[in-house]
Amino acid sequence: DIDCLVIVKLHHAQKKLERGFFTCASYKEYTEKSQALLKTGVIDQASLDGARIEKYVIGPVFNLNFFYSPLSEEGEKLELLGVDWRFESSLDGHVRLPAPQQMTMPLHQQIPEMTVVGHNTATIRESLLEKAFELGEKFIQASKEHYDPGIIGPFCLQTCIDKDMNYYIYDVAPRLGGGTNVHVNVGHPYGNATWRKPMSSGRRIAMELRMAAEQDRLLEVLT
């Protein structure tokens, strides 16, 4: 039963590795949109049959780019290097149009696609930082319990923050996040503050490997 706004997650039928996501707020809307997307070839029946339906959290989306160091003897083992957000096509183009214009578009243009085409850097208000670290620490602990030796180095928690300032994690990247490339030249805002110099994710990985080699502890950071 669909009794609130949801997002239906499945693969795009024609674009490899891209999304065929769509939103709906009722079973009737689910049926109408899925049939329209099937007709236009955006999705296929096999993917629709295995689609995942999640509650859609209304709020801004932030990717939290963390780094976990098992080598750290002093200070914090978990670092928040930076935050980014996404540009999605054709969704971002749709939201710049007045609602009446969206309603008069041809059927094949009315349902936006959510293909990530870029990223930009962001910050979050200070009162939300403590909770962000709590999420990162919980993820590290869970990864150790279920996938020994757990997460090492960079990882990304993809979150949404609602109107009551609650975080919702809708996906994770147990690796270098795609949005970190916006910080290659100038570093991450939070990483720069921690290390007092431009600190991109790539530089932080290089530092960790150098420290591990100098301490003869490479096996602790490599799997």
Write out the residue ranges for each language-model feature.
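A short beta-strand motif that forms the metal-chelation/ATP-contact edge
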Residues: I7-K9, N65-F66, M165-L176
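A short glycine-rich, hydrophobically flanked beta-strand micro-motif that places a catalytic Asp/Glu
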Residues: E54, N65, Y147-D164
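Short acidic/glycine-enriched loop/turn segments that link adjacent beta-strands
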Residues: G59-V61, S90-L91
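Conserved active-site beta-strand-loop modules that form the wall/rim of enzyme catalytic pockets
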Residues: L64, E76-E79, L157-Q158, M165-Y170
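ATP-dependent carboxylate/phosphate-activation module, predominantly the ATP-grasp catalytic core
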Residues: F66-S143, A173-G202
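Short, well-structured alpha-helical interface segments that form or flank functional binding sites
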Residues: K131, P154, Y167
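Peripheral (often C-terminal) accessory segments that flank ATP-dependent C-N-forming ligase machineries
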Residues: C156, D162, N181, G187-T223
